[in-house]
Amino acid sequence: VLIKPDKDILEKIKHLPFDYYQIYDCTPEEIKEIKQKYNKKIITALTIKDEKDVEKYQSFLEVTDIYLFDSKGYEKSMAFDHSLIEKIKINKPLMIAGNIQVNDNLENYNKIADIIDISGGLETSGVKDKSKIDIFLNKIEQVKNET
């Protein structure tokens, strides 16, 4: 995860075997430059509060490989209305994050996103919780078997 990365950071990590850079707070022009210079696929992270924020995805069409719609503030406890991205129809994978919890209805997310970032939702007191991970994996299997 890179938040408005500067050249020093990019130079330090350029030899690491990342397939993707997940980038927050950059313009399409900055992302294009990073993508070309470092030959990496890009996950463009857009922080969402309202429909106006969602519409920003259009300016990144040429430079992103995966869209990540996340809540404002990079905080695990914050959420946004995931239904705001239901209308997006593009030929690129959509990922959602933002206070997704293990007990949420995964079918709802399955309808609007290709990838779910539930990282914080699988934690208890800041540590990955095996029981939550098991519950989540079982729920994924159920959704897969129903579709």
Put a short name on every predicted segment.
Residues 1-6, 10-33, 40-59, 65-78, ...:
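Catalytic beta/alpha-barrel core
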Residues 1, 34-45, 84-102, 136-143:
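Alpha-helix-loop-beta-strand connector modules within alpha/beta enzyme cores
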Residues 32-37, 119-147:
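C-terminal helical cap(s) of enzyme catalytic domains, especially alpha/beta-barrels
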